[in-house]
Amino acid sequence: MTHNDSRPRATSTSQTTSQNNRVNISVPNANDLRKFWARVWENPVHHDDNANWLQIEQTRYLNLEPMNFQGIPVEVFHDVLKNLQNWKAPGSDNIHNFWYKKFTYIHPVIYKYINKFIEYPHTLPDYIATGTTFMIPKDANRLSDPAKYRPITCLQTIYKIIASCLSRIILGYIDKNNMLAEQQKGCRKYSQGCKEQLTIDSVLLKQTLKKKSDIYTMYIDYKKAFDSVPHSWLIKTLEIHCIHPQIISFLKNTMTKWTTRLRLTQNTNTIITEPIHVQRGIFQGDALSPLWFCLALNPLSHMLNSLNKGYNLPYKENNTEIRTEFSNYKLNHLLYMDDIKLYGSTQQELQDLVKVTENFSQDICMEFGIDKCKTNSIKNGQRYQHQYHMQTGSLIEALSEGEVYKYLGYNQALEISHKDVKDSLTKDFKHRLNTILKNYLNSKNTSKAINTFAIPILTYSFGILNWRKNELKSLQRTINTTMTQYRKHHPRSCIQRMTLTRKDGGRGLIDILNLHNKQITNLRSYFHRKALTSSLHKAIVFNDNKITPLNLTDKVQQRNEIQINNQIKLNEWTQKALHGRHIHDLNQPNVDKIASNEWLKRGELFPETEGFMLAIQDQIIETKNYRKYIMKLGNSSDDSCRKCKSSAETIQHVTGACRAIVQTDYKHRHDQVAAIIHQTLALKYKLISEKVAYYKYTPQTVLDTAGYKLYWDRTILTDKTVHCIRPDITLHDKKQEIVYLIDIAIPNTHNLSTSHTEKITKYTDLAIELKTQWKVKAVKTIPIILSTTGVIPYTLHTSLKLLDIHPLTYINLQKAVILNTCRIVRKFLSIDAPTTIVLG
């Protein structure tokens, strides 16, 4: 029941690994686990209805226009379904979001029942409000302690749909009336969340250190915040914010049915407890809970703001050269969900702020986690240690010398230690990168894993930490060099292709420098835009003069905002003498660039194979010619082919022009492509009944039925002498009286056009002869041509259309060619070759 927010959670793979390697680990049994959490959730409490501040809060919004609610609008319902994540963990019903999204026939029924449940809350079945709570260890060394687990509850999908619909409606009303305090960034639409709070916090702390002035701060942490908030206060919160009575009635009734079972899995053993009836705390795992919790703490912001105390941020209303009077913005707290930081100009001010927070917390029956509450103050630009005595008698200690506090994901002392945090992030980034590359993912999933698992550990720091350009480029190089270590990238391949999109011929990795600069731009734009209407943001923009990486005072575009778009990378790739040959081939008018890059877009090959094929396309394979003229090695005076000895050993020669392997390796590649066409036609005309993998398919010489006859590599006898009488495949359509002469060619890319013309010319005489001899209406010559590197000419699509076979058949043809070309090059280089770098 911990809330679901966007803050990074600390994870330790080493701890997890050691935990999994231990066999006999003591974990709580089902009774102990249930007993502990039942004490938390089955212990109902009631907030203080007589609190003085509550009387003020209950009248705050009375003059607002009442909330209009006549059931869930159908457009909201459909939008919620559309945005569901397909395979997110389901509840105890085990029905994933995917089925609710795709079974559109039942949408009207679901919509009808959702509105019925809201109108008549007692009709809601109990099982819909039942969850399964997974217990996630917080500390691998204290697995026996039930308190050291984080409860994550998976709710029924239908419950989450209802909650999402209500959340959108409630949030729309809250935003429309600007009810949520500006200091709260949890659940605030279009805000920058934790980054926004950290930027504001950095400006305050660094300005204080720079001016050698005073600031008194305290970190407040609630003890099991989401698990301890009273149900009575949750309902009162909705009433205070004027939420429609029908919605309140539904939620109030639903809360009485909240039930969950705890589930703890350790190695192969799974513990499932008896049900716990949740009478305190709030479920996590749905869209409504975070917003509901933020509303529960919203009165605290109003109470703190009403004190008119806090740290003074001077700013000018109009930041121009014209003399303008300074204004002051008093900031006394920042909130992100339940993470609270208080700010005072004096120690007494801080104590007043803490006292208000403590009183509010006591009135709503929530407790401070004293061990996680700390003071962290600066006096005359130096650390100042002081304690705070709570009304309960507990003592909040100061951060000691050398101690840090993890605030919104970052360790702070007087300020964030950029170097230490960057070193830690880089270490974690490399660890995740290695973890990904050790696994046997296909190419597309490898790139996706790097983009979504490794790089995001850096992303959160962009705009907060001061990353230099060379550091970001070094991180990008780390991806390349690590992939090279795992034989998944050639060290001399075109670097632009690594971060180009797959449809453009790249590998689809995120450009870390671009990502950083884009986030800087977005954050700067956000603060400048908010400064037009918000005094807080205006004050931050005014005071951030090279204090944070955003440098908000300067409105001119910063160097760390410049981005290199795809077109610039494509131009750089094109201008390269060697690497640029492939993209030059792709840009020829007879080549389908999109289809030629389809194998990359699909990403089905292993990354070793993909990396090797890109190296072949980039022409940086260590052939003898490459070693002599590009690497210019002194011992490479002879560049003649190691096989045929008749031509220079270039990569084009190896892939498609060496006479020594025409009847072996080239023929094997040719026959596999031909086999795909043969099997496709045989299945289409029901000459065979079973489909097998193309590399296992052995075509029969003749397949014949009453309507069709299919020849494989068979000589056609003619009455007159014809030189070319053995096409790869011959299809005789007896019904339509048409003969198709199908011939396969896999030339090097620069020979695509001439190969097509040669094939048409080659069988012209045979076509004329067969038309008369077989008494058919037409004889059509169908060349099936694609290049050795998988480049697809437009003529291939025309040929497939003439044969009336599926237009995407070219994908299998392309895959077969690429795999065989890689096999040919590997085999070729392994024969009497000097030391070469071969991937895969």
PLM region descriptions:
Residues M1-P146, I161, L395:
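Surface-exposed loop/turn segments and immediately adjacent short secondary-structure elements
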Residues G393-K469, R487, N522-S535:
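Basic, alpha-helical interaction scaffolds
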